[in-house]
Amino acid sequence: LTLAVGLLPPPALAQPLPRYLPGLTGAAVLTVYGQSLLGGLVASRWAAHQCFGARELCQVLHWHLLGVVPATLVALAVGTIALRRQRITPWLGRLGQAVLILLALQVGVGVATYQLRLQVEPLTVTHQAVGALLLGTLVVLTGLVRRTNRQPVPTIT
């Protein structure tokens, strides 16, 4: 999908996008990616089980829990800004809506996973899958915003 976005011509805009949007979408990609890596580390090392039981690997779990705040706030900001521009730029609004829906689903599944202490494996896998979908959506959004915001380079004739 990202390759297809890169090959398509940039979408036309009635108004330019805010100058800060490419940087903000990039920050969202980086924070969600970092959070996904921490989540993968928690799952692969069974850090939650070891922390709840033997009080080992608690630092890994705590870093993942602390990372929820910045990743959620940046993704929420990107989704909200994109959704608010829906009348001017419909594709941006649709992607913003997808980000917000996936973010709400991710937080809900994450809370349920934590409350059940990662004992329900399909729920843990769903948490990882929704995180990957959120990351992919943010990557596509970032690519489109960056391509759309590029100013044409003046040529000397």
What does each of the following model-derived ranges do?
Residues 1-157:
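Polytopic transmembrane helical bundles with strong interfacial aromatic enrichment
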